[in-house]
Amino acid sequence: MVSSPTLRRIAVALERNPYEVVIGAGGLSRLGDELLKAGIQPGRRILVVSNPDVAAPYGEGCLQSLRQQGFHADLLVIDAGEERKTPATVAAIHDSAFEQRLERSSLMLALGGGVVGDMTGFAAATWLRGIQVIQVPTTLLAMVDAAIGGKTGVNHPGGKNLIGAFHQPSLVLIDPETLNTLPEREFRAGMAEVIKYGILGDPALFQCLEEGPEPNSAAGLGNSRLETILERSAAAKARVVAADEREGGLRAVLNYGHTFGHVVETLCGYGTWLHGEAVAIGMVAVGQLAVNRGSWTADEAGRQTQLIQRCGLPTAWPDLDPDAVLRTLQGDKKVKDGRLRFVLPMAIGRVEIRDDISRDEILHCLDQLRG
């Protein structure tokens, strides 16, 4: 087995089925080795699910690494835009699983961004009542957020991710070199989730992003700084997931910026904004809500907005009908007993969850955002 001393390892310390997030340049070539280290025995069948832009440069290398270690691997290529994140696409994955005769000992492996990871994870959760899944994210957003934690699912016309399941991966492998072929817009979208971790509990990470070269491309960050950002973000996500696997309480903080962000995605139409772009807009919106309540200072809200802009992300609220916004908010999956729950910033590095925000507060905030 090939030694891999350069790979960084982060434990997701779940009570049941703990796993590792493995980070390092060249990691994709050692994928088969890492499956063996994770206790996955050779001879098992693996359905690799990817999208065309990722499968072209990385699909064959992924299959080769798996086959060299004795796995029977096949590749399914699907369209993976946000508008394709539907039950119909999951059914296509199930069809391939049937054709490839995947058994309960078989695995699915997601090679791609957050949409591929979400759909592959959900397909694995529902095939034969659940088979193992491996996450190999190739976008920044998926690396720091979507691939870690076991949240899987697809969209419904009424809202984002309303159909889904918790299904933890057996391994997450992050190879930063795959970001070299990622379009810059998608890289910038992933930076929204990195900023989120700074707000949630890592002010040093937030300050790191404020300083030095503008963090709006992998090349601009440089290998060392990029791997540090990946490691700190993944570690932050792993800590929260380990403490609250199924979003019973603490894990809800990971939805910072997402409540308004999902409204933007839903009402503007899936695919109009990338997920991270919508989250960036949502963070600005919820920041304004917190300032209005007096729980956050205008100065720190301004720092957040400036950093979002520094990363090349949008901050302006789109022209949306306020009543449609309220209706969409009420359909959010985080609503509890009919009450909206928002993650509000209190300081850079500290947030709170509130369910006492009134309709009038939201409408006033929307008026301010529209300028």
Curated annotation (Swiss-Prot):
Lineage: superkingdom: Bacteria
Broad class of where this protein is predominantly found: cytoplasm
Cofactor: NAD(+); Co(2+); Zn(2+)
Keyword set includes Nucleotide-binding: yes
Cross-referenced Pfam families: DHQ_synthase, DHQS_C
Pathway noted in the entry: Metabolic intermediate biosynthesis; chorismate biosynthesis; chorismate from D-erythrose 4-phosphate and phosphoenolpyruvate: step 2/7
Chain positions recorded as Zn(2+) binding sites: 193, 258, 275
SUPFAM superfamilies (alphabetical): Dehydroquinate synthase-like
InterPro entries associated with the record: Dehydroquinate_synthase (IPR050071), DHQ_synth_AroB (IPR016037), DHQ_synth_fam (IPR030963), DHQS/DOIS_N (IPR030960), DHQS_C (IPR056179)
Keywords, alphabetical: Amino-acid biosynthesis, Aromatic amino acid biosynthesis, Cobalt, Cytoplasm, Lyase, Metal-binding, NAD, Nucleotide-binding, Zinc
EC number: 4.2.3.4
Residues binding NAD(+), per UniProt: 114-118, 138-139, 151, 160, 178-181
Signal peptide: none
GO MF entry, a single one: metal ion binding
Key word Coiled coil present: no
Compartments in which it is found: Cytoplasm
Cofactor note: Binds 1 divalent metal cation per subunit. Can use either Co(2+) or Zn(2+).
GO cellular component, one term: cytoplasm
Reaction catalysis annotation: 7-phospho-2-dehydro-3-deoxy-D-arabino-heptonate = 3-dehydroquinate + phosphate
Enzyme class: lyase
UniProt GO BP: amino acid biosynthetic process; aromatic amino acid family biosynthetic process; chorismate biosynthetic process
Protein family: Belongs to the sugar phosphate cyclases superfamily. Dehydroquinate synthase family.
Cited function: Catalyzes the conversion of 3-deoxy-D-arabino-heptulosonate 7-phosphate (DAHP) to dehydroquinate (DHQ).
Annotated protein name in UniProt: 3-dehydroquinate synthase
Gene: aroB
